[in-house]
Amino acid sequence: MRVVFRCPPELIEVLPRPVPARDGLPEWLRAMPGEARVPELGGEVRTLKHCPPFIDAMRTGFLMPLAADVRVEGGAFRWDWALPATALGRTTRSPLSFHHAEQASGSPLHDPDRLFLKFNNFWTIELEPGWSLLVVHSVNRPDLPFQTLTGLVDADRYGDGLIHFPARWLDPAFAGVLARGTPVAQCIPVRREALELAFEPLAGETAQRFAELKDALASEPGVYRKRFRAGRS
């Protein structure tokens, strides 16, 4: 799957670049234990570190980075970023901007006391024909002080435009620096095709396979990882 990113030539050596999600896993995932003791069981259980679907979701697609350090203090957002001018003109020079909370009126997202941000993106994203881009908050990252909203962009057709990333600011007590490179969105290419839903009874050979797999899952660890997990580059 080829994804083409473009930016003004004056910014090509200035901007942080999108990275494959597999290269942007958080440090806490590496540091977390593989097992944890459960007093009620009197023993240990395997943690999320041993859950391939949890990790593979975090490794899928690519991450879009925050363009510059942003200092947050007392509800104010500040940055010191000398972005060069470009010959293209009419492009924002700020790593983030703001939405009005009223733009979410009537939805469960609306909260007049909660800031709505827009993380500005400086890279166009072009996908191969027939593919759209599912944009989500970085998967399994509740540790971030914001929540990026989900969107779907037909990036095979919109490859010459900039996709920005609206988000809700979740932590009013946060004080510190959102570092350049912080993942502000996870992007997953999806093929644009109609779904065909089929419903069948679990019987005969499928019922036998179901029973065999259920027994295997109950008798040994790592069955999914060893027998069913697909290889990923």
Which role fits each region the language model picked out?
Residues 1-162, 168-233:
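Non-catalytic terminal segments and appended small domains
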